[in-house]
Amino acid sequence: MPTRAMPIRPLLAALLAAYGLPGMAAEPVTELGVVRVTAPRPDGRSLFTERVDAVRLPALRATTSDTASLLRELPGVTLYGAGGVSSLPAIHGLADERLRISVDGMDLYAACPNHMNPPLSYLDPNQVEAIDVWAGIAPVSTGGDSIGGTIQVRTAAPAFAAPGQGSLIKGEVGTFYRSNGDARGVNLATTYATETVSASYHGAYAKSDNYKAGGTFKTYDFTGRIGHTLGRDVVGSTAYEAANHALSLAWRAADRLVEMKYLHQEIPFQGYPNQRMDMTDNRSDKLNLDLTNRMGWGKLKARIYHEQVEHEMDFGPDKRYWYGPASGGPTATDGSPCSPIGPNCAAGMPMYTEVKTTGAKVEAEVARTDKDLVRVGGELNRYRLDDWWAPSGAGMWPNTFWNIRDGERDRAAIYGEWETRVSPAWLTLAGLRYERVSTNAGAVTGYIHATPPYSGSGGAGNQTTDAVAFNNADRSREFNNWDLSWVNKYTVSPTYDIELGLAHKERAPSLYELYAWSTWQMAALMNNFVGDGNGYVGNLNLKKERANTLSATFDWHAQDRDWGLKLTPYYTRVADYIDAVRCGAGMMGNCPGTPPNPSTNQFLRLIYANQSARIYGLDISGHMPLSETGLGAFGLKVVVGYTRGKNLDTGDGLYNIMPLNARLTLTQAYKGWDNALELVLVKGKDDVSKVRNEIETSGYGLVNLRLSHGWKQVRLDFGVENLFDRLYYLPTGGAYVGQGTTMTNPSLPNYPQWGTAVPGPGRNVYAALKLSF
């Protein structure tokens, strides 16, 4: 690799600024002249990484209030449909708790049997400064208790006044509007800082009504509520409202940075078109204390954090609220208000979840030589969950149903990794991690029991029978997870790099996979975090998932990166993959104590089960300039994704695997304008999970138009998505259960019925304006 001259002072300043210590970078440094350096070592943790950074974020923020959607242009990343601010990212077909997702270093988990509040939903897109994604081959310092990859989200780093400036005051205010759903919102950020102290606030508010599809996709109007109907192109239960607040305080010295962040969120409502319930309230508070200390031998980082979530669910305005014989019974398309609340009359179905998460991390980074770096660290995470359903009448009567009581999931991990430059062209990173995961849950009861906490028999759907069996079982579980990774980068030439990685990853089952105990159809339907309309039952005998992944990236590019092409093939084999098997055909049948339901066209009940799986595919991404004309500089960007997943025990397809898809973008830069014409192509989906009766979807193509202009202190974004108002169905959006009698699986002419996938949004005209000061 050729050498080049580099002044010491700018190099030192750049390195110190990169470590978040601008105070050191800004101090006077004695000029030592010029030295020659050879093959500067990049961060090995950047291998197999994709980043959404400050350059890409502004245009993405204008189109969405869902932070997970900021990842939609990355190769290998797709989204599971959920609420308007709560999509779940998937990497190569592995999603949710198969990924390790952190927000400012905090490991967070959903606090809901439907996973309505996944980690990325706790930030507004305007609060995000950068997102790093490791697909499958994550270093052990960033991985753990996951098999699919890692997503790390960072909010804005603290800003400080420059030497001699005295104080720094800055901020921004923004607003947006999106026509489809009448979505609107505002955001505000402000900072006051001296050379050593920084204080900042960031707030954001977003609200939307239901969005419309690109055409009629259903044959009914009723919602289950008297006097309330929805147009046949309106996607029910897609409205939302969310408010986010963040306060940050930071202090720095020459070699130390201490930062405290407080995050508060309130979501008074968020609908879910692929779930039986809606979020009727969600309040969360997070406190995060971080220390970074530069020392002569390297760097020491420590963090402690705490989160508390109070979550409520019930039937939103597009779903039936009144149940029981006095409301018209199960065949009524609209439930009538009734009283008194009791065996014949139910007012909704309130469900509550409370979660407390406390964590700590410490990591030491030791530079042994100018070619070798060692990282060692330890982590603790303590997760507590209670999930109960208050009595509301009819079948939900007369006692409280405990879905999970005194749920516990504790993680303790240690790891070490070694990064070294074997030669000027070869960088390698190898690591080993051990993690112990302990889970437990307390005794439960259903709505019906003779003598608390459990006794007797019967109850709707075998509630008491199931509760007795669960309570008499040993519920304590211990899992010993091992995580190994080895990644390499070889620079073949100035225009060609190869990355090669091997990884062994392990994940312990979640609390809901283990402890959702009731086989009752209604209760099982409420325990679903994949949005397929089915009901799920936990399994105390689940083993941990064990995945082996091989991946490579072939990267051709210009020396100045003006053009580039990346190909990333990957292969993953998972032992004890947590899939599902069918329960019996009868509503009251224990699971799996009766012959499985053979249906191919209805919603089902399933129980989690360990099986084996295989996932493979190819990611392609590239960019190139096309021409420079009087109308500006034109370029082309391409992202292609192909993933196949198979259950090796049954030969069935894996659930929610995105079919072949491509995103082609023609870009234009002209006199301050950055514009794009985007074509999104998705193949029809027929390789589905038959055990779940997953719904097939047709292929489609969408055209999006995006324009933006930046002035010194003003930025304007506007555009049109789904320009031709195409009706299409989301391949990973789940089953449509967004309106009607959603508590159960009703008979015709009532709805919801199996067979309709959630449609994507129709034409949407959007605009966003940001003013900086």
Which positions does each model-derived feature cover?
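Solvent-exposed loop segments that connect transmembrane elements
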Residues: G215-V235, D314-P350, W388-W402, N440-S476, ...
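C-terminal beta-signal and adjacent terminal beta-strands/loops
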Residues: G214, R507, A580, K683-D687, ...
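Outer-membrane beta-barrel signature, preferentially recognizing the C-terminal barrel domain
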Residues: M277-G296, T353-V355, N403-R411, T464-D466, ...
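Short acidic/polar hinge/loop motifs at secondary-structure boundaries
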Residues: L108-I137
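Flexible loop and strand-edge segments within Gram-negative outer membrane beta-barrel domains
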Residues: A242, D255-L300, Q308-P340, C345-T357, ...
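Gram-negative outer-membrane beta-barrel transporters
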Residues: R421-L427, R436, D562-I578, C583, ...
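Periplasmic-side early beta-strands and strand-to-turn transitions of outer-membrane beta-barrels
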Residues: A159, S167-G174, R178-G185, A189-N282, ...
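N-terminal periplasmic "start-of-domain" segments of outer-membrane beta-barrel proteins
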Residues: G33-A68, L88, D96
